[in-house]
Amino acid sequence: IPKTTGVILCKHQSAWETIAMQLIFPRQSQVLKKELFYLPFFGWGLASLNPIAINRKLGTRAIKIILRLGAARIREGWWVLLFPEGTRVPYGSKGKYTQTGAALALEIKCPVIPVAHNAGAFWSKESFIKRPGCITVVIGESLPTCGKNRKQIMAEAETWIESTCEKL
């Protein structure tokens, strides 16, 4: 894990990684949907973690909020975690990757850190029941953003995340 902060792009298969990433990358701000705050107890605790909460119905305005608040958090020494597929996907599946994380990294001139794992095999999106097993997390090399555009950055991150997940 680099000493300087940046943008974390993590596969999103379960609730597990939302908790674990807080321990792996301390002093972190997650981009999440605002509706999670409405869950009793859980939402209240979540609000105390300094997340970047967005209303996904706002479309491009939500992206501008992520860029503004994300840049501020990184300048303050926080990691910013995004799930580039936008929502949890079933284990072994692939969602559509958005370019918001790459846009933030370019805005602040920081690297992107890709993260792959197999948590969805044990903490399934489809079930409340958790299965026993060993969750493996792989943190990729820091991906430089200098001289690249959003599409190139996301293609590199997506390829690494998906190919690494296939090996787990």
Predicted regions and their residues:
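Catalytic core of membrane glycerolipid acyltransferases/transacylases, capturing the structured
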Residues: 6-59
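Non-catalytic C-terminal accessory region of glycerolipid acyltransferases
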Residues: 64-168
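A short, conserved beta-strand element in the Rossmann-like catalytic core
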Residues: 1, 14-15, 87-88
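Generic beta-sheet signal
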Residues: 4-10, 78-82
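A short, glycine/Asx- and small/polar-enriched loop/turn
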Residues: 1-5, 131
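Short, flexible hinge/linker loops that cap or flank conserved catalytic cores
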Residues: 1-2, 45, 74, 106
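Structural motif corresponding to alpha-helix initiation and N-cap regions
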Residues: 3, 39, 64-67
